[in-house]
Amino acid sequence: MTSLRPFTCDDLFRFNNINLDPLTETYGIPFYLQYLAHWPEYFIVAEAPGGELMGYIMGKAEGSVAREEWHGHVTALSVAPEFRRLGLAAKLMELLEEISERKGGFFVDLFVRVSNQVAVNMYKQLGYSVYRTVIEYYSASNGEPDEDAYDMRKALSRDTEKKSIVPLPHPVRPEDIE
């Protein structure tokens, strides 16, 4: 049976099989440690019965309560290829949403490559909608052009009027994101 548990420092040396996916954003060890130190409850790993890491979600709480922008943010969600199509990503998202709800968030948001239609469709099935397009959010390699992202959001119960998910009428640039 799969177990979902808090991510630990030791997991940093065990999750390469998950991060080898070209659509997964990878970061340096200090970045992961910062999340682990500041938002440990938002950093969850799925582990197979034999101890193999199957996937993880890394997020944080951010924004302004006064402006009704306090929310959970999904920084990274990735499942190893051999464990996809089992509902694991949906379960990890559900856990992060529950944590954000308990922390009084108005919504949960994430960024996803416009070209990653499989992920976009999954997020839509989970109740997320495109809030805005962010032009050239993802840096490209090999001389390719930078790629746009969708900022997708799902309102939580605190946002009774669903104001947080009203789409913006125009795209924005990365420097315009607060």
From Swiss-Prot:
N-acetyltransferase domain mapped to chain residues: 2-157
Write down the superkingdom of origin: Eukaryota
GO biological process: one example: N-terminal peptidyl-aspartic acid acetylation
Keywords, A to Z, come to:
Acyltransferase, Cytoplasm, Nucleus, Transferase
Q: Give its localization.
A: Cytoplasm; Nucleus
| Record function comment | Catalytic subunit of the NatB complex which catalyzes acetylation of the N-terminal methionine residues of peptides beginning with Met-Asp, Met-Glu, Met-Asn and Met-Gln. Proteins with cell cycle functions are overrepresented in the pool of NatB substrates. Required for maintaining the structure and function of actomyosin fibers and for proper cellular migration.
Database matches in PANTHER family: N-ALPHA-ACETYLTRANSFERASE 20 (PTHR45910:SF1)
Q: How does it assemble?
A: Component of the N-terminal acetyltransferase B (NatB) complex which is composed of naa20 and naa25.
For this entry, the protein name equals N-alpha-acetyltransferase 20
Record the organism.
Xenopus tropicalis (Western clawed frog)
